[in-house]
Regions:
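Membrane-interface helix-loop junctions and terminal tails of multi-pass membrane proteins
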Residues: 1-197
Length: 197
């Protein structure tokens, strides 16, 4: 699988799972209506896990322009590949969102709250204080990137008899998923934690 296709499929699955849980919790007449923030943050974390496991062996599973750009700035990813990765991520995100809309179309039609409908596809601040909202997103994105840099550091070693690769595509999916989960639980209440440019 090419890195472009891996980023596309991994991001599509991430958005399908993440947007799907928001639709399930926030739209009218769903089985998960009203399940709450813990359900949303947990499913987003598991969506990250799924996307990383699928894309990791082929692309490193950036699944996020902030990761691609951050790794390029840090000198661990070639700038010449950034546009290809981001294009795959954007197309994958659009396809994932389209699938969420198709699956929940009847529930979008049954929902009278335009903010709930919009919230399936984007984040927005709970209290509009843009400098504080920006700070929260910046800190959350820093936390995500710090963990990603730690996991992808070539100086880290792991001794084992296993032949499984260590990195974002295997064992590395667990700390990335937990990081997204804890960012959502701790910092996501203010903006919905896009942690993405």
């Amino acid at each position: 699988m090419s890195p472009f296709l891996a980023e596309l499929l991994g991001t599509m699955l991430l958005i399908l799972m993440g947007g799907g849980v928001v639709a399930n919790v926030c739209l009218s007449k769903t089985k998960g209506n009203g399940a709450g923030w813990i359900a949303i943050t947990t499913a987003w974390a598991l969506g990250v896990f799924i996307g990383v496991v699928v894309a990791g062996p082929y692309s490193g599973a950036h699944l996020n322009p902030a990761v691609s750009i951050g790794l390029a700035i840090g000198g661990t990813f070639p700038w010449c590949d950034v546009c290809t990765y981001i294009a795959g991520q954007m197309i994958g995100a659009a396809l994932g969102a389209l699938l969420v809309w198709l699956v929940y179309k009847d529930h979008f039609n049954a929902t009278d709250d335009p903010d709930a409908e919009l919230g399936v596809f984007c984040t927005s601040p709970a209290i509009k204080d843009y400098p504080i909202n920006f700070l929260g997103e910046m800190i959350g994105t820093f936390a995500l990137m710090f963990v990603v840099f730690f996991i992808t550091d070539g100086e880290l070693t792991y001794e084992s008899n296993s032949t499984l690769p260590i990195g974002l595509g295997s064992v590395g999916a667990i700390p990335v998923a937990f990081t997204v989960w804890v960012i959502g639980l701790s910092l996501g209440g203010t903006t919905g934690y896009a942690i993405n440019p």
